[in-house]
Regions:
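Large intracellular
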Residues: 2-10, 16-147, 232-273
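Helix-termination/interfacial motifs at the ends of transmembrane alpha-helices
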Residues: 9-12, 19-25, 135-229
Length: 273
């Protein structure tokens, strides 16, 4: 398992590009740093997620996040070759002969599937077991993806909420104190008040900035990456299922190879001489 540099590079590149956009428009980076705004967005997003999910589900995000920053290569060709190799043995000596080959199989799903094929004579029951395993894998993957997609939806909402809060506070401070229906005489420098108003508006909008930033640079992209990786893994699992069913049916290894290669994109298939 290798480190997936694209995730880290994408995050860093996004921050750099946004920073260039700020500085390039005669802005200062420190204008966009506000702890309270950050607390409202991240704290609010986490709180809403806790309402939607259990603490156990959120604590289970660590291995999911680890998967985002690691790259597990799914080599379709090597999986197909492994299946064809086992198919040759099964066709020559029977499916039961694969029992002594189980320790040589690295992929847990393939190893468990072949073990099921050895012990289960009914092909329909075998396919049902394997399909159930794939469904459970998809369900586990979807749970992690869903959390990040929801967080991507919550973050802008709390960003807007923080902005509204800031505007309300700013207007109250600008308008002065009001008791009942009596309004005290206003005695202030209008220029200073207007400058304070603009400054307060800028601070209020920072919360929206944080909400949009975390949603579109962190939460939604992570959810999308998890979904893409899940699709790749499920593709390999489907190849394995079809291979195991073909071995169980004692199909010819050449036919098995040709059938399984239909799962692979034509551009990734080896050239035939």
């Amino acid at each position: 398992m290798k480190i997936d540099l694209s995730t880290a590079v994408g995050l860093v590149a996004g921050i750099i590009i946004i920073s260039i956009g700020i500085v390039g428009n005669s802005g200062e980076l420190y204008w966009f740093i506000n702890g309270i705004s950050l607390l409202v967005v991240l704290g609010g997003t986490l709180s809403a997620t806790l309402v939607n999910y259990s603490i156990k589900s959120l604590l289970g995000l660590y291995p999911v996040l680890k998967n985002v920053f690691t790259h597990e290569s799914y080599e379709y060709q090597s999986v197909i070759e492994e299946i064809v190799k086992k198919a040759k043995i099964a066709r020559k000596s029977g499916v039961v002969s694969l029992e002594k080959e189980l320790n040589t199989i690295d992929d847990n799903f393939l190893r468990n599937g072949i073990e099921l094929a050895i012990n289960e004579r009914d092909s329909k029951r075998l396919r049902t077991f394997l399909a159930l395993e794939i469904d459970n894998i998809e369900r586990r993957h979807a749970s992690g993806q869903e959390i990040f997609f929801y967080m991507g939806a919550y973050a802008p909402a709390f960003g807007m909420l923080g902005t509204i809060m800031g505007l309300i506070i700013m207007m109250e401070n600008f308008g002065g104190a009001q008791i009942g229906m009596q309004i005290d005489a206003i005695n202030f420098n209008i220029a200073e008040k207007f400058a304070g108003l603009l400054q307060g508006m800028g601070l209020a909008l920072i919360t929206t900035f944080y909400g949009v930033l975390f949603s579109n640079l962190v939460f939604l992209p992570i959810g999308g990456k998890l979904k893409r990786k899940s699709q790749e893994e499920i593709m390999v699992r489907n190849i394995i299922v079809e291979g195991i069913m073909s071995i169980h049916a004692k199909e010819h290894p050449i036919l098995i190879h040709e059938k399984l290669m239909t799962f692979v994109q034509e551009s990734k298939r080896p050239n035939k001489d």
